[in-house]
Amino acid sequence: MSHLAVIPARGGSTRLKHKNITPLLGKPLIRWITNAVLESSCFDKVIISTDDDQIFDAVADLNVERHIRPEHHATVTATVLDAMMDLMDEVETYNTFSYFLPTCPFISPDDILKGMEKLEQRQCDTVISMTQIPETVQLACLMSEDNVLPVFDNLEWGITNSKFIKKYYKPSGAFYMGLWNFLKENKNFFAGKTKGVIIPPTRSVDINTIADIKYAESIIW
């Protein structure tokens, strides 16, 4: 099977200026995920999709190619999914398509290999990196001025012991993988059979602020 990886990184980040090239322990943020993708040795081609020359310059010495991200896909309101689906129309066809976000620097080559193995064995249509939600979701309630309404039935049944409460997960944001033809047809990573690769909380850091950078550096050390 042939595999394409894309790392989308627009230049116009708002909360943290130049986020994708902000140093994390002296290394531009985008290099962390780029190195992991390359070290996995899974992909026939790795593309950096960016509208910013500085972002590509930060990884230009690595075995990557550049896709110039169109202006309409580089705005604050643009979605990564739309940008990736359009990019698939512009490049040659592969068997699988994956994209990785530079804001999640602690993904390992082994995480990527686990996801790709699921696709190659045709266990599913798509694979998404997942992490456990630390809060006990089943204790959630909706509140109004007049009432407190449990979201889940367990509170009505008096079940609050964590031993009897299910674990909930969410996308970690690090990567999305899928079979090429499936994505071309559905343009959605959740439309078919989806499997997850669980990323532990200590490696599920999503960097959007300086505080996130400092937290990430504290974890490394």
Please name every model-derived segment.
Residues 2-49:
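N-terminal glycine-rich phosphate-binding loop and ensuing alpha1 helix
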Residues 10, 71, 131-132:
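Histidine-centered beta-alpha loop that forms part of the nucleotide-sugar donor binding/catalytic region
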Residues 42, 61-63, 144:
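Short, structured coil segments at secondary-structure junctions
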Residues 43, 92-94, 123-124:
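Short, high-confidence coil segments that cap the C-terminus of an alpha-helix
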Residues 47, 53-98, 106-114:
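Short phosphate-binding loop-to-helix
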Residues 82, 105-193, 198-199:
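Conserved core of the sugar-phosphate nucleotidyltransferase
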Residues 185-205, 210-214, 218-221:
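Catalytic donor-sugar/metal-binding loop of nucleotide-sugar-dependent glycosyltransferases
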